[in-house]
Regions:
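Cell-envelope and extracellular/periplasmic
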Residues: 73-354
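Acidic/polar, compositionally biased interaction segments
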Residues: 1-72
Length: 354
């Protein structure tokens, strides 16, 4: 192998899987006729040649096979199985286990409808977030995720009520206007998208779920629901547009207020997470504008007294394991778990009144 790590051998294909394989004197695979496969991981040193032996138990030997690295850095399985992180994701039989008190429903993208747990080979902040709020609340928890990547608050997610404005010689669209911007003094030529369309798509999908609560969640039929809070981790696309970055704070304040109004949840808590790559001591330009905006709306910052005790911002740079928002943090599961957990912990503090 090229890299040092823990590996699992899967020799044979079809009937030839029935064999016993040893690597460097250690049995790593056993599949006897009529019995279950037994595989044992082995640590191998990158670049080092080692002997192996395969004893086929049928006449179907074909020599095909492959190996799988078990401890790929940044994967959830490696973090749990080899670094001892997030032990609550597995049961005492070392099987991934779903919670029976936190339910996940995803719409638009990241779709799914299941009890919160590991699966599908994908991860989002909702996994860590759900465990934190689930541990806090005695009542069952519903996480309703409505999301779409590569969307800006200044254009795609622009909330209702935002007006057009001028910046850098351009007029930027207000809610429902199109296109995104146009030269001052010219007539705008609409395109097949408008300011706030992603807001409309995402939150109308959320309404559709909640308006049909009993049908969507028959296990909670007749119980009803209460919206306790919103979680918002966004900002990547806005940093590529100076006009959008300049209004990020105003738009975020309005988003908080309008979501509470739209979902008839005036007391709902609001947790925001900053972009993981953006550091306080080095941020510049548009990235600094967005970071400063996200930090400014935190109720403890003092700029918005009405947000005291009900809006909190999580500074995520210390939690990011590298990469950036535009690369989905290189898919590092620890980044998503730790930021999700931090957002959940922040939500719990707001719910506790701390």
């Amino acid at each position: 192998v090229k890299k040092t790590g823990m590996y699992e051998f899967r020799p044979g294909y079809g009937g030839s899987m029935q064999n016993v394989m040893e690597v460097d004197g250690k049995e790593v695979h056993r599949k006897e006729v009529g019995k279950e496969i037994v595989r044992t991981g082995i640590k191998l040193e990158g670049g080092k040649k080692i002997p192996f032996k395969i004893t086929y138990l049928t006449n179907d030997a074909n020599g095909l096979g492959w190996i799988v690295r078990l401890d790929v850095p940044g994967t959830l399985s490696a973090l749990v199985n080899y670094e001892g992180k997030y032990p609550y994701l597995k049961n005492d039989k070392s099987q991934w286990v779903a919670r029976d008190d936190v339910y996940y429903k995803g719409v638009v993208t990241a779709t799914g409808s299941r009890w919160l747990g590991v699966g599908s080979g994908k991860i989002g902040p909702e996994l860590g977030f759900g465990h934190m709020v689930g541990n806090y609340d005695e009542d069952p928890v519903l996480i309703l995720k409505t999301s779409q990547g590569n969307r800006s608050l200044g254009w795609d997610f622009l909330p209702p009520g935002r007006k057009q404005y001028e910046y850098g010689g351009k007029i930027y669209a207000g809610y429902k206007q199109s296109p995104e911007s146009w030269a001052k003094g010219t007539e705008p030529k609409p395109i097949g998208w408008y300011a706030g369309k992603q807001y409309d798509d995402c939150f109308s999908a959320a309404h559709e779920v909640l308006n049909n609560f009993d049908e969507q969640f028959p296990h909670w039929k007749g119980r009803g629901y209460e919206i306790e809070g919103f979680a918002w981790w966004q900002g990547d696309k806005d940093r590529y547009n100076a006009g959008h970055a300049s209004r990020y704070e105003e738009n975020l304040v309005h988003l908080i207020k309008i979501l509470r109004e739209e979902f008839k949840a005036p007391q709902a808590k609001f947790v925001i997470a900053t972009l993981g790559q953006t550091a306080k001591n080095s941020a510049e330009g548009n990235e600094k504008l967005i970071l400063d905006a996200q930090l400014a709306v935190d109720g403890d910052a003092g700029k918005y007294p009405e947000f005291k005790g009900n809006v909190s911002t999580v500074y995520t740079h210390p939690l990011s394991q590298g990469g950036a928002s535009n690369s989905h943090y290189e898919g590092n599961a620890q980044t998503y778990m730790d930021i999700g957990r931090a957002m959940g912990e922040s939500m719990v503090k707001l719910l506790e009144g701390k």
